[in-house]
Amino acid sequence: MALKEMVGTVVSDKMQKTVVVAVENRFPHPIYQKIISRTTRYKAHDAENHCKVGDRVRIKESPPISAHKRWTVTDVLVKGMKSKEAAK
């Protein structure tokens, strides 16, 4: 079975070597066909602490690293804005 890969946004980087990545899943409602958006948060391993809040990252499924970590950050696709830049 192939390992799953997902793309999401880093929403928290307050832990050491761990980031929380929010992945948005969009799908049509089975009856009404309205597009529904669901967000799932995954804890992912970031060995070098490269990721910051707002970064767009790709995560890949991995063997369990801790009680809640089952994903690893493979690469940073887009760097997020710094908080001072976002305020302008």
From Swiss-Prot:
It comes from Prochlorococcus marinus (strain NATL2A). Belongs to the universal ribosomal protein uS17 family. Pfam families: Ribosomal_S17. The keyword Ribosomal protein applies. The keyword RNA-binding applies. Keywords: Ribonucleoprotein, Ribosomal protein, RNA-binding, rRNA-binding. NCBIfam families: PRK05610.1 (NF004123), uS17_bact (TIGR03635). One of the primary rRNA binding proteins, it binds specifically to the 5'-end of 16S ribosomal RNA. Part of the 30S ribosomal subunit. PANTHER family: 40S RIBOSOMAL PROTEIN S11 FAMILY MEMBER, SMALL RIBOSOMAL SUBUNIT PROTEIN US17M. GO terms for biological process: translation. GO terms for cellular component: cytosolic small ribosomal subunit. One of its GO terms (molecular function) is structural constituent of ribosome. This is Small ribosomal subunit protein uS17. SUPFAM superfamilies: Nucleic acid-binding proteins. Gene3D superfamilies: Nucleic acid-binding proteins.
